[in-house]
Every structure is written in structure tokens, then in C-alpha cells.
Amino acid sequence: MEVLRMFRKGAVAFSQATLPLLLKGVKQESKYPPSLIFTGATASVKANAFMSSFNTGKYALRALSSSLAKEFGPQGVHVGHAIIDGVIDIPRTKEWLKDAGPDAKIDPDSVSIT
């Protein structure tokens, strides 16, 4: 359940820290509406066997983004949930797809600012 705790605490803390800044962007009448985009996976809409913690965390993240969209959308902040599937090349996935080509895994820098 550590995965669920990580998804929940990280996303909520990030939202709490960024939404006040995004609301300021609305007040400044930015040319582009401020946006908060969460990245999910197909697991957020379809469960997989042996992935209960991951599935639960992704479902929770999708629910959070949906709730925030309903709460902050009318105030001018766009909140979205994008499904991006693939194995991210991190130490935990080192052995996954090891015999596949160099493009089989996603570079972590291509999906986030690190």
C-alpha cells in the first residue's frame, strides 16, 4: 500500500502547492489558461492482475484530477488527466524489456522535469 500512499500524498501535496499559483494566473488574465495536468496510465480505467497497488493509485489519481477539474474549472483553471502508457527507464524497471531495443523504455526526462 506504499504505492497508494505515495500517489495520494504526492498528488495532493502538489495540488495544494500549485493551485494557488494557478489561480493567480487566472486573475492576471493570462493569454493561456493555467493548467494542472496529471499523468496516468490505462490502469486508471482498467485494472490488471497482480497490480492492485498500482491500479488503486492510478484510479485515485484520476478521481483526484476529476474532482479538482470540477472544483477549479469554473474558476478558470484547467485540470486534466492524460494517459501515458509505457515502461519508464528507472532502476526498478532495469530488468524489464532488457532484450528489447533502445526505444522500448521511456526516458524519465521526456515525461517530467527532473
Q: Where are the predicted features?
A:
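Electropositive phosphate-/nucleotide-binding environments in soluble metabolic enzymes
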Residues: 8, 12, 58, 105-112
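C-terminal helical subdomain
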Residues: 74-90, 94-114
